[in-house]
Amino acid sequence: MSSIPVIELSSRAREIFQLVVESYLGSGLPVGSKTLARQGVNLSPASIRYVLQELETKGLLLSPHISAGRMPTELGLRLFVNGMMQLSEPSEEERSAIEADVIRGHSPKERLVNATTTLSGLSACAGLVLVPKQELVLKQLGFVVLDDNRALAIIVGSDGSVENRVIELSSGFPASALTEASNYINAHFSGYSFSEAKKRLFSQIDLERSELDSAASDLIKRGLAVWSEDSRKRPVLIVRGQSHLLQDASEDLDRAKQLLEELEDKKEIAGLLEKVSESDAAQIFIGSENKLFSLSGSSVIASPYHGEDGHMVGVVAVIGPTRLNYGRIVPMVDFTAKTLSRIIA
């Protein structure tokens, strides 16, 4: 979590500040002295107003209108999150829902999608999962003729994923060479990553060239080469629940539109979430603390999940307005990350 300047608060100011933040996060409305008095603050309204003014001077609160109450600034939210937030673990029902939906997936990607969708629904935020894409391990590869000059290379990965690429064929390319090439690849390279397969390919194919049709030999080389290094290592970002960001749009339509635009910049989001990989616990980015979401004034709560060997595999996160129930959502994101670590690993 981000560090903040040392801010000295009296016990009275600390109590009032915490009440203001908790009330604001619950209602989304500025908090005034009368509201605080009703919550049991044992001070006169005038004394409460004095403390509120003091907190505003320190940059922890602001007043959106002259006659309105106070609401926390980003600095105030950071102070609250770092030292005053009361964490509330997910309920048994919430934990069961997350675990059941992750287990229900038939492939790693489907499990990640399910986790993202469930987390989004429970938090009423947009849910994200970042997967630094691992090099694909070949299970099976086949070719399908599209027309006289093109074939579709279809690869099935060991994780159940399926990818397609179009390969150009020379005029009169024999259909038998497609079958011969796919049979050779599946017999010799199943269970290998593409970089490993390429190394084996050039050491083996010369020895066995006499047993292979020249067209099949050429197709084998291109069939393995078509999956480029860049495409294999491009991170995958799954986003679900964008509709939750529009629920309060009637109050702040411009902010919601801005956030939806920011969510389209998947490369920048991936860069932000990759920073989380250096930590074992949930990280919180509030408003302008991250450049990407500074215009919309949004918060990101993200936590890494790990593989069997303990290395970071990906990051799960939620994005929403800065007025989030941090105490509830932070443990929920952490639990989802731990569930993914346990089940997917």
From Swiss-Prot:
Gene Ontology biological-process annotations: negative regulation of DNA-templated transcription
SUPFAM superfamilies associated with the record: GAF domain-like (SSF55781), Winged helix' DNA-binding domain (SSF46785)
InterPro entries documented for this protein: GAF-like_dom_sf, HrcA, HrcA_C, WH-like_DNA-bd_sf, WH_DNA-bd_sf
UniProt keyword Repressor, yes or no: yes
Molecular function terms from GO: DNA binding
Gene3D superfamilies in UniProt: 3.30.450.40, Winged helix-like DNA-binding domain superfamily/Winged helix DNA-binding domain (1.10.10.10)
Highest taxon of the lineage: Bacteria
Keywords (A to Z) from UniProt: Repressor, Stress response, Transcription, Transcription regulation
S-S bonds: none
Function (record text): Negative regulator of class I heat shock genes (grpE-dnaK-dnaJ and groELS operons). Prevents heat-shock induction of these operons.
Family, as annotated: Belongs to the HrcA family.
HAMAP family named in the record: HrcA (MF_00081)
Name recorded for this polypeptide: Heat-inducible transcription repressor HrcA
Gene source species: Zymomonas mobilis subsp. mobilis (strain ATCC 31821 / ZM4 / CP4)
Lineage, top ranks: Bacteria, Pseudomonadati, Pseudomonadota, Alphaproteobacteria, Sphingomonadales
